[in-house]
Amino acid sequence: MNQNADFCINNVNIATMRSTKQTENDPYGIRENACIFIKNGLIDAIEPAKRRLSSTIKTFDAQRKWLLPGLIDCHTHLVFAGNRALEFEMRQQGMSYAQIAQRGGGIRSTVNATRLASYEGLLNSAIGRAARLVEEGVTTIEIKSGYGLDLATELRMLQVAKDIESYLLVNIQPTYLGAHSVPFEFHEDPDAYVDFVCEHVMPEVIKQGIATSVDVFCESIAFSPVQCEKVFRSAKHYGLNIKAHVEQLSDLKGARLAAKFNALSVDHIEYLPPDDVPAIAKSNTVAVLLPGAFYHLRETQRPPLTALRRHHVPIALASDLNPGSSPVASLLTIMNMGCILFGMTPAEALSGVTRNAAQALGLAQKGQISSGFDADMCLWDIQHPNELSYGINQIRPTRVWVNGKER
C-alpha cells in the first residue's frame, strides 16, 4: 500500500488502455476490483482493491464503477467567429464544399468574421464550445488557428486557445495552422503567402511560445504538396511538430509527404490509397479519422481502415469541431460515428480518443492509466467501456480528474 499518495480510488474497475496489457480477448487492458493511488498529479500505483486503507490517505469508494483515461480530442478548430449555417443550406440545395470555397465561402467567410472579432469575443465563444467537450470527459483538447491568416489574428487565436486553461480545467494544445487557406490579399500569389507563413508568422509563434505544432491543408482547394513541403521544412527548422490535413477530397500524396517529415499525424485520409499506408506505418505517424466531417459533408469515400489495421498504424478519432464541415461538439458522438460510419470497433474507438490521440499530439504521458502517467481520468457509471461508443448523448462521467485535480 502506498502511504504517501495524495488520494486513492478504491473498489474500481479500470480500462487502462495500455498497449502492453491489451490482447485480442481484452482490447481495453482491464483491471477489475482495483485500487489506484495518485501522487503529485501522476498515477503512482495500481493494486488490488483494499479492505482497509490508511486514514491518512483521502479515499474515494468507486463502488465498482469504471475508471477510464481522460478523453483527448486531438483535432479541433474551435476558436472562430460567426457560423456557416447559410452554407449548410446551400449544400442541402446541391452545392459542393469545393464549389462554396471557390465562390469565396468556406474557410474564407470564417476568416472575415474572425479577423473582425475581439479577443474577448473569441475567448467567450471558444470557452462555450470547449465546455461542451469537457462535460463529456474530455481532459485534453488540441486547438488549431487558421481562421486569421494574418499575423495579428493568428497570434490572437493561439493566445485565446491557450487562455481557455484559465477558465476550464483542461489541457490545451495549440497548433499553428497558417497554411489553411490562401487569404484574399494573397490570392494572386499563393507562394508569397507561404513565404509569409514561414518567414513572418512562424518565427513569432516560436518567440511567443504559443504553439508546439504546425499543420497544413494539403488539397486542391488549399495548398499543393510543394507548398506544404516548404512549411514542413520551416517547421523542422524551428523545432515544431508536424500535423497535416491530407487526402480529404482527393489524393495528392500529402500523407506520403507528411510521413517523410515524420509527422505526428495525418488527418482525414478518406482518399489515402492503401498502397501509401506502409509509409505512414514506417514513420509511426498516427492516422486521425474525422467522421464528423465525413458525415456533415455527406462523403462516400471511407478511410482505408483495413490497410491501416493490417500495417498496425495507430488510429485516432477527433471531432474536427469547426463551423463549416464538422460543427460537432461531442467526442462521444464521434466515437459512435467511427463505429457506424467507418466500421471501427468500440475498443478501437476508445483507443482512438485516449492512447492513440495522445500519440497524435506527442503527449507520451497521457492517454493511458499506468504508473507514471498523468492522472487524467474519468469515472463512469457503466457496465462496460464499450458503452461509450454504443449510444448517443446518453452518458456523462460522474467524476473527472485532470493532472490529479478534480473538476
UniProtKB/Swiss-Prot annotation:
Its cofactor is Zn(2+); Fe(3+). Belongs to the metallo-dependent hydrolases superfamily. HutI family. GO terms for biological process: L-histidine catabolic process to glutamate and formamide; L-histidine catabolic process to glutamate and formate. The keyword Cell membrane does not apply. One of its GO terms (molecular function) is zinc ion binding. Fe(3+) binds at residues 75, 77, 245, 320. Keywords: Cytoplasm, Histidine metabolism, Hydrolase, Iron, Metal-binding, Zinc. Pathway: Amino-acid degradation; L-histidine degradation into L-glutamate; N-formimidoyl-L-glutamate from L-histidine: step 3/3. It is an enzyme of class 3 (hydrolase). The keyword Metal-binding applies. It comes from the Bacteria. It is found in: Cytoplasm. This is Imidazolonepropionase. The gene is hutI. Catalyzes the hydrolytic cleavage of the carbon-nitrogen bond in imidazolone-5-propanoate to yield N-formimidoyl-L-glutamate. It is the third step in the universal histidine degradation pathway. It catalyses: 4-imidazolone-5-propanoate + H2O = N-formimidoyl-L-glutamate. N-formimidoyl-L-glutamate binds at residues 147, 322, 324. One of its GO terms (cellular component) is cytoplasm. Signal peptide: none annotated. NCBIfam families: hutI. Its EC number is 3.5.2.7. 4-imidazolone-5-propanoate binds at residues 84, 147, 180, 248, 325. It comes from Pseudoalteromonas atlantica (strain T6c / ATCC BAA-1087). It holds the Pfam family Amidohydro_1. Zn(2+) binds at residues 75, 77, 245, 320.
